[in-house]
């Protein structure tokens, strides 16, 4: 049995008002998850992406790829206050 591998960029952010983290994939609109720790959020997001992709495939829809996202980094800017 052949296996096809997919890669997706994910973004993990600190919840603004609650303890924990929130994750989403810019490539898969509507696919998101959360968790108490970064590790739990990453694991939960992996499951959410798997379910999302399986749903797309079951409906015969194309699976978007992260080809447009080639690099992610955080920038810090100093601006006059």
Predicted regions and their residues:
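Short, charged, surface-exposed hinge/linker loops at domain edges
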Residues: 1-9, 43-81
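A generic structural signal for ordered secondary structure
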Residues: 22-24, 32, 49, 77-78
């Amino acid at each position: 049995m052949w296996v096809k591998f997919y890669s997706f960029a994910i973004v993990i952010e600190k919840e603004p008002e609650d303890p924990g983290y929130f994750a989403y994939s810019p490539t898969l609109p509507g696919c998101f998850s959360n968790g108490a720790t970064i590790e739990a959020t990453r694991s939960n997001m992996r499951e959410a992406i798997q379910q999302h992709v399986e749903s797309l495939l079951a409906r015969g829809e194309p699976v978007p790829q992260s080809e447009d996202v080639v690099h992610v980094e955080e920038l810090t800017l100093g601006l006059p206050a």
